[in-house]
Each structure stands twice: as structure tokens, then as C-alpha cells.
Amino acid sequence: MRKDSLIEDYFEVIDNEHKAYWLGFLMADGCILDMPLSNGTKIPRTVQIMVSLCDIEIIHNFMHDIELDKNIRYDSRVSIHGEKLEYCKVTAGSSKMCNDLIRHGCTQRKSKILKFPVTVPDNLIRHFIRGYFDGDGSVWYCERLQERKDRKNPSIQRNFRSAFQGTSDFLEGVKSNLEANGMTIGNVRKGHGDVSCIEFGARDTMIKFYHYLYDDSTIFLKRKYNKFIETFNYLNMAY
């Protein structure tokens, strides 16, 4: 396999905002691919990121930071509802980068065993969490009519909420850090299979979460950032 030209020791030490962000994103939505050897064993060889085409900025930003110069690959499939889903992906071939990521806890087949990292400095944890949120977190707003027996007319229930998915061990680390910064976070709940989740939505917590993620930040997924701003404005919330 041809070796790619890139900053191979980029993840050797997590010592700035962007490195912490990318470690978080890769833990959520990246993968490490093994290369089989002639003796039947395998070694970690390639880092891969694949995202929806609408989030291609992630690919461009990652390639820029690790100084990777290669073509982005595009693919598509049809969902069970008949909708065409378009993707883009990039791979970075470097055993050194793979092994550094594994040392920080970003392992192969991490969906069942992922733990909150101990190698990210305290002052960079929020950037790490933002990266993970951009990869495997969500923010949404919805409205529905709610009927109550003690009221003549139904009221509108407004839900502005956010959530993370992952292993229960990892999410306990996220929950602990968010609560240490004044947010009210729900308990880690078991989801489908090995996936757990945490969810929260008190208005003061959503405002604190927004500032925790984005204050003085230079890298983030614009789509999720814009969802916060659009919802704050729609609800006339001061933030």
C-alpha cells in the first residue's frame, strides 16, 4: 500500500484546539482500518473519515490540518425510504498516525469499548467534546400540541434539545465535564445494542452548552452551529 504524504506525528501529543477536536471527531465518526500481512496478522494502517456530502467541510478541514493532499472519494446509496444519500470520504495511510490515535483511545472496533480519554489536557477537553459532538451528537427543535385535562385548549410544547451517543463509559465522562461547567444533564440511558445516550434540554443548559462548545473556537461543523443560532433566534432567547 502506498504511503500518503501527511504530518504523520500530528496526533503524537494533543496540545492544541484542532488536535483535540479531531481526536473527538475521529472517536465519534472515524475509523482505523487494518492492513493484512503475509504472515496472517494485521496492523493498523489507515485512518478514514466518511461524512454526508453536505458536511464535506469536515473532510477539507481535516486534510488541511494534517497536510494531506489527495482526492476525496464520493459515493451514494438509496435509503430504505427510497431517498438518495450521498457521502464523501478520505483515507490517510500512516501506521504512525493510527498507533498514536490508538494510544489516545481511538481504537479499532471502538463502538463497544470506547472510554473517555486521559491524554487530553483539561484546557482542551471542551474542544475534544465539540469534535465528538460534531461526529456523534445532535441538536434539534420541534413543536407539538399538548392536550391537558385541566385546560380547555391544547398548548404548544416546544422542545429544544441536544444529545450524545456512545458507550456508557465514554458518556459518563462527557456528562461529568458538562455538569462541572454548570449544565444539567440527564442520566446515561441504554439505547439499541451497545449504544447508550445522554440527553438534555433545559434552556439555561442549552445556552451554557452553546457557549461551552463555541466560545473562542476556530473549528466546528457549521450545520450544527447554525442550528443553535436559528433556534435561539426563533425562540427569542438571549444567548
Which ranges hold each PLM region?
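Internal intein/HINT superfamily modules and their associated LAGLIDADG
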Residues: 1-239
